[in-house]
């Protein structure tokens, strides 16, 4: 009798272990590691605020977020496999990396147009729309291949001036270098620098969206490591769906203002101004890489790629979401 009970207990315990083993992974959240350029901006906050609001958890996702100094650094983290997803990588930089054989895929648009602006110290001789720029002056961008790198190149080309391009890292570091006189012309993105403009410490030179080639094109994208994307395609589809849900919530619900204000270290009034005045929701569309033919032309002109990508290459590179 005792042996029979022992055998029954063994079967029950074994069955419980098997059930736990089988149910554990199915109920667990899938982990995605994200690298995001430029902490503190409206569009760089989406993953973190969406996770705090429980949106990604509802979609059975756990995000681990690290921040980089710009799109080039973000791109390298994805290529190396240090992270799974890169948010806000410069589109031309991604085209160049893919053309060289890097294991990277575009899984969504990130910024069609951009909120960036260019500024100088109030005592600078540089005027509106880069008037007075000389070849020995320095013009900032974050990292090689980033959206700010692309924008700086386009301004020089379309406004017909020459300056020394200088990598300055993230927005706060760039501001410090301009104010200390190390760099002549800096870039920034709201909310950074708005208080300095109001205080008369700096002057606005140009908006990136002044350029038609910027405001009508998807200048930044969300990218994934090709190997992990192929292995976990359903997880990435769920991620983009949750990311879209987070964007919708952040524009529809005023409750999103307080966490963004805390995230960026600004007042709720400034947080609302940043969202409503500088980041139209259409800028953050995920479904398309808009202006791709022109982007490829620029990639050739700026020597990111030696020649146009073939239709087969474009089909492989673009893994943008399909609407349900």
List where the protein language model places each region:
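Bacterial N-terminal signal peptides that target proteins for export
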Residues: 2-14
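Hydrophobic helical h-region of N-terminal Sec-dependent signal peptides
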Residues: 14-18, 22
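Sec/Tat signal peptide C-region and signal peptidase I cleavage site
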Residues: 24-28
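Short, glycine-/small- and polar/acidic-enriched structural segments
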Residues: 29-161, 165-168, 177-180, 184-190, ...
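Short, solvent-exposed loop/beta-turn-alpha elements that line the ligand-binding surface or hinge
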Residues: 58, 132, 210-215, 280-288
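Pocket-lining segment of extracytoplasmic ligand-binding domains
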Residues: 92, 172-262
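Periplasmic-binding protein-like
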Residues: 110-120, 203-229, 312-324
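Secondary-structure end/capping motifs
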Residues: 230-306
């Amino acid at each position: 009798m005792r042996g029979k009970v022992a055998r029954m207990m063994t079967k029950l315990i074994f069955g419980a272990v098997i059930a736990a083993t089988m149910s554990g992974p199915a109920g667990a959240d899938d982990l995605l590691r994200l690298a995001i350029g430029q902490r503190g901006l409206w569009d760089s906050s989406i993953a973190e605020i969406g996770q705090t609001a429980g949106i990604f958890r509802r979609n059975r996702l756990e995000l681990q977020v690290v921040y980089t100094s710009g799109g080039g650094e973000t791109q390298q983290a994805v290529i190396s496999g240090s992270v799974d997803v890169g948010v806000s990588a410069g589109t031309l930089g991604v085209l160049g990396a893919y053309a060289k054989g890097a294991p990277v895929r575009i899984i969504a648009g990130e910024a069609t147009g951009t909120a960036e602006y260019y500024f100088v110290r109030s005592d600078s001789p540089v005027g509106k729309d880069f008037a007075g720029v000389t070849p020995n002056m320095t013009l900032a961008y974050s990292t090689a291949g980033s959206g700010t790198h692309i924008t700086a190149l386009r301004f020089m080309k379309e406004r017909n001036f020459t300056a020394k391009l200088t990598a300055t890292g993230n927005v706060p570091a760039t501001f410090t270098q301009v104010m200390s006189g190390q760099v002549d012309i800096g870039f920034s993105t709201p909310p950074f620098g708005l208080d300095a403009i109001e205080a008369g410490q700096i002057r606005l030179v140009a908006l990136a969206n002044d350029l038609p080639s910027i405001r009508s094109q998807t200048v930044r994208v969300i990218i994934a490591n090709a190997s992990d994307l192929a292995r976990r395609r359903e997880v990435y589809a769920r991620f983009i769906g949750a990311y879209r849900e987070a964007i919708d919530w952040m524009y529809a619900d005023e409750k999103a203002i307080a966490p963004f204000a805390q995230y960026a270290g600004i007042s709720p009034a400034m947080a609302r101004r940043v969202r409503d005045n500088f980041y139209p929701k259409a800028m953050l569309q995920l479904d398309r890489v808009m202006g791709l033919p022109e982007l490829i032309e620029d990639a050739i002109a700026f020597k990111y790629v030696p020649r146009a990508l073939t239709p087969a290459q474009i089909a492989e590179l673009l893994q943008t979401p399909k609407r349900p």
